[in-house]
Amino acid sequence: MNFCTHFDKNYIPYGLTLLESLNNTAVDFTLHITCMDNYTFDYLSKLKLSNVKLYKIHDLESNIEGLRTAKKNRNKVEYFFTCSPATCKNILMKNPNITSITYLDSDLYFFSSPKVIFDEIKESSVAIVEHRFHWITKRQIKYGRFNVGWVTFRNDKEGNSCLDLWLKDCLNWCYQKVEKDRFGDQKYLDKWPKLFKNLKIIDNIGANAAIWNVKNYKWSLKDDKILLNNIPLVFYHFANIHQIDSQRYNTNLSRVLMPLNGVLKNNVYKVYLNNLNNNFGSNKILFKKDNHLHGIKKLLIPIYRKISSFIFKDIIDLRL
């Protein structure tokens, strides 16, 4: 299994926690990490990590034509979005014998083996996962039907054609703006099922559970396995976490009116946050701002969130 991700020094703890979770599954894998600054490359190199191959940002920008030009006309987050397909392309260029490459967001955590997902994908040239929005989060469909958290490309004609299209689209336009057919690097995926016949939409609900779909499921624990609707959790996408101080984190589950208790609290969020916290030291998570709130929403939504957070008590204190 060949996975890839990319991040800078601010997300090193995320990347290390992702790596640890993959190691815990005991699968045979390589995690290809594109280091988005020199500090990250030097830091990770000193750790001599197993199952990891590191790439420098300079090499990425030298190998992918148009990347440096794109860097000049978008902000840092938008540039990182642009580098999602570029990272995949660069790895396949440097490792032509790889059968497939799977892009992962760095804030994922595996609770069981990803083999079950690859068993479902089989010989598909492309594999993507839906957000599976709950009705409360359905309005977020404007950001895309599919989530970039997991994207697989087989190193065949159709897989490379899809990857090349994604790269071309992102180099041309990749901004934090919601438009009819595009948003960042993500909404481009919506057109892929119609364009690529050998594309697989992953059915396993244990893949990419997250705050936007968490209310769809009944969470339980059986034989130390975390289940959602009796299906084993493969990986959880820990988006929207906010570090309050060195030991306290806001899960922001109140945004979707989800109580933080039971299996979800003790076996999902606490497990992840303890591991993440161990990799942080004195650093803090940089919380992404709400870039898309305007007008009355910009005033009312923060008030709503404070009230719902008070009611649902979605803060985890790791000292307790």
Spell out what each predicted region is:
Residues 21-29:
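Short, acidic, metal-binding catalytic loop of nucleotide-sugar glycosyltransferases
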